Amino acid sequence: MFSRKKRELMKTPSISKKNRAGSPSPQPSGELPRKDGADAVFPGPSLEPPAGSSGVKATGTLKRPTSLSRHASAAGFPLSGAASWTLGRSHRSPLTAASPGELPTEGAGPDVVEDISHLLADVARFAEGLEKLKECVLRDDLLEARRPRAHECLGEALRVMHQIISKYPLLNTVETLTAAGTLIAKVKAFHYESNNDLEKQEFEKALETIAVAFSSTVSEFLMGEVDSSTLLAVPPGDSSQSMESLYGPGSEGTPPSLEDCDAGCLPAEEVDVLLQRCEGGVDAALLYAKNMAKYMKDLISYLEKRTTLEMEFAKGLQKIAHNCRQSVMQEPHMPLLSIYSLALEQDLEFGHSMVQAVGTLQTQTFMQPLTLRRLEHEKRRKEIKEAWHRAQRKLQEAESNLRKAKQGYVQRCEDHDKARFLVAKAEEEQAGSAPGAGSTATKTLDKRRRLEEEAKNKAEEAMATYRTCVADAKTQKQELEDTKVTALRQIQEVIRQSDQTIKSATISYYQMMHMQTAPLPVHFQMLCESSKLYDPGQQYASHVRQLQRDQEPDVHYDFEPHVSANAWSPVMRARKSSFNVSDVARPEAAGSPPEEGGCTEGTPAKDHRAGRGHQVHKSWPLSISDSDSGLDPGPGAGDFKKFERTSSSGTMSSTEELVDPDGGAGASAFEQADLNGMTPELPVAVPSGPFRHEGLSKAARTHRLRKLRTPAKCRECNSYVYFQGAECEECCLACHKKCLETLAIQCGHKKLQGRLQLFGQDFSHAARSAPDGVPFIVKKCVCEIERRALRTKGIYRVNGVKTRVEKLCQAFENGKELVELSQASPHDISNVLKLYLRQLPEPLISFRLYHELVGLAKDSLKAEAEAKAASRGRQDGSESEAVAVALAGRLRELLRDLPPENRASLQYLLRHLRRIVEVEQDNKMTPGNLGIVFGPTLLRPRPTEATVSLSSLVDYPHQARVIETLIVHYGLVFEEEPEETPGGQDESSNQRAEVVVQVPYLEAGEAVVYPLQEAAADGCRESRVVSNDSDSDLEEASELLSSSEASALGHLSFLEQQQSEASLEVASGSHSGSEEQLEATAREDGDGDEDGPAQQLSGFNTNQSNNVLQAPLPPMRLRGGRMTLGSCRERQPEFV
């Protein structure tokens, strides 16, 4: 192959002909062009490196896979630096490097031809070396000498290649070094003993690869077409990336020896042999295996943290690209819009692919396989270590036994020698003794002979034991050696498996990272080149060109004098800061003087006062006349006309002045006050002004809203409002724009007070502000629950939503009595009431009465149990009832010692719980259930250091028993005090008159007795009305009741008012009423027909939507607080 390439090169035109044809000749180093700033020229005297530079020893071996790119950075080598020799593609004659003093002359010099011949001679020597290597490896004879001979031929070929690359650095390319590394690996791994065809094919392929790579590089070098991106130029003096790194350390300028070639990678058998020969080889191998496990753990930790960062970066990039894409793509004609649109898409694709790649790395290719391999590695290492230590312990025991047997054997031999000496001595003494002493000497001799025989036997036994221990020690030693061989082989196998796993995982990781990051430079370069093509102002011109607008019309300015149409306008007389229904006259009377339109029909004269302080608040709007009792108002009642109002602040309010055609005011007017002088629920007008398009809550519609001008604190969410805020012109309430949907504080038409610390405060402080001693929060919650939640299943037992409960508590502290509860959940309201009572520092039933009340409950339970035991199977429950009555009597005596406000609030709350119990079939709340709920709340011991004391846990049933008894026997416990109402009630009204109303369609024998709920006894008498929201109830009521029954109901309502002197409250319109106004109404309509009272009450009994109609009820009989109704239907009477 090399000979054919040589002949082709000889046929190519010479360098001189190229120069004469116009090809550039070698130029001085100072004139060499720079290519993109990456190829620097070093003005050295020669391309050949100094001789001493080749003597620098390189460490390690450099092996590269054959699939690497031609780019130098892909092989792990940096591009040529400032001190490296590089040459661009424009240099056609790279054979010699002209120094500044040796500039080439015209034509082809003789040195050029000599360089070509020298290069071709070196290439021929390299080809011969490869041929010798091929013959040595593939020959079939001399099996023992083939390996060293092959390594010698390989070293000779690499030495020639190293000399060529040292002389011509431009030949040092990635392909050449990669092919050389592959050839070295194949030669070292070749099995010369076995005739394996697969290994021969791989060796021949590696040999052909290096020949093709080197010949191609030489051909490109001679043609001047060497690609600078494939060079591996090494700075002078740095040989760590040169040819020496392919085959390890060597001598200066000499090829490596056979030992140096073999030191790179020893066969597995040789590694085991080396470890077997050295002392502590198994321990060294085990230590390496242990360190390798730690190394894998560190690798996993590093890659896990790195992939986590990659994942976070990819997700963050996706997020910002997705968020910015919407805003960037809004305007169509922006500069470089397509560039950044493409960049955002590339970022999204990169982030998506990176997330997938990281997930693959974590689950499939790197972390999971490496983790499993580490665990298996540690398991096998520990097993091998245990087997090795077990073999060592056996050998140590054998050696110990051997030492003991040797000592015993030596001792027995010494004893035997001593016995033989004594026998010999006795024989000599016997021989030299006198004839008369022969018997004694004979006995002594016999004795010593016996001792000598015993010592001989013991010595023989010790020798046998010694020999056995020696044989056992040899056996254990051999077993240890066998275990050593097995352990070393297993350790190497485990290490090789772990190496293979690490290798495959690493290749997969970096290959995947290369696949992810390789397109990025191309994308960035493409974006850069595309950005260079943009002309400033191009997109702006395109935008202007696409605008399709009409020609701008000519405008003329002329002076127009003002002509006044009227001398008086009702709008000019409007008050500045607040709204009054009389400020705007009817549209027909716009030109009339003030005397004619000052007071309209149906509007009191006091309503025309123009000051805010003189405004009179009414509970019902006056837009519906007294005679209009239908659900649909007449044409004159519903036609309103809006007039714009000029505010002193320059802002629009949320409600506008509404005037009906008859002059009646359609805006909010109020006539009666609540605890603080304001009604808790105000009529709602149609929203308008700056917040008319917002979803306003029922309470928010009562405010006159304008835009917030200064930062303030939101009364709904208790955070500061800086932008997009609203405030009320009358009560100065500030609120976020978004909080208007859930605002629960109504307008009080005067400046709202600061926040009240309500929860957790002393009960006497809250009760001091109430005339009857019942705090407003208790009244609000109880009235709302009685209005619409008496029959709610699980009331007080089911908890509300925590967030809504907290907002309600905050609303009570901010708005006090002005909190709107009609849109709140009944369970939330009941939870607020329980929370208020639970957070009192001292409960309603004082601490000092706790032990007495609990003691009464214990005695009552004990007595009831004894009564049940005494009655045995009898059905009579009089004993239990007597026990309960006795307990109620004693409770009445104890509760007299409570403070007045505590007793009043407790009576108010128990009356409410009594009403809940009366409908327990619907709400499932029995007195026992309510006792369980309110027992620990109303009656608890004095707090101690423990969070929940044991005694309080034990007393829970007794607390529930006390509250259950108070609910069941409410009339007995509080019989001495009449029920009081906020409107006032005389004690003499305890006795009720008996009212009998005949029902025309009921039979005499059918009578049903209903308990009359004492709704007039407290501040929130419940009125039953029929709303448009329940069409079925309205139809049923209209079918059952006639006009005559409604007339009878009118007389009945006024009779009940005279007997109890209690004011009626309208549940749909407001929670409290004014007794004086009802009495005044009764006086005004008392002389009319019998439908007058009912119609007068129904005129005022309207809710915020003016869609409520009174429902006539069946006639009834009142006797002592109970109602007797002659009806065959179980129908509860309803009052209007």
From Swiss-Prot:
Q: Where are stretches of biased composition, namely Polar residues? A: 1095-1109
Q: Which cysteines are joined by disulfide bonds?
A: none
Q: Which domain of life is it from?
A: Eukaryota
Q: Where in the cell is it found?
A: Cytoplasm; Cell projection, Ruffle membrane
Q: Where is the composition biased (Low complexity)?
A: 646-655
Q: Which residues carry this modification: Phosphoserine?
A: S23, S25, S73, S93, S99, S569, S578, S592, S619, S949, S1027, S1030, S1032
Span of zinc fingers (Phorbol-ester/DAG-type):
702-747
Q: Coiled-coil stretches, from where to where?
A: 376-412, 440-499
MF (Gene Ontology): GTPase activator activity; zinc ion binding
Task: Share any extra remarks.
Answer: Infusion of lymphocyte from mHag HA-1-negative donors results in a durable remission in mHag HA-1-positive patients with leukemia or multiple myeloma.
Q: What is this protein called?
A: Rho GTPase-activating protein 45
Q: Identify the species of origin.
A: Homo sapiens (Human)
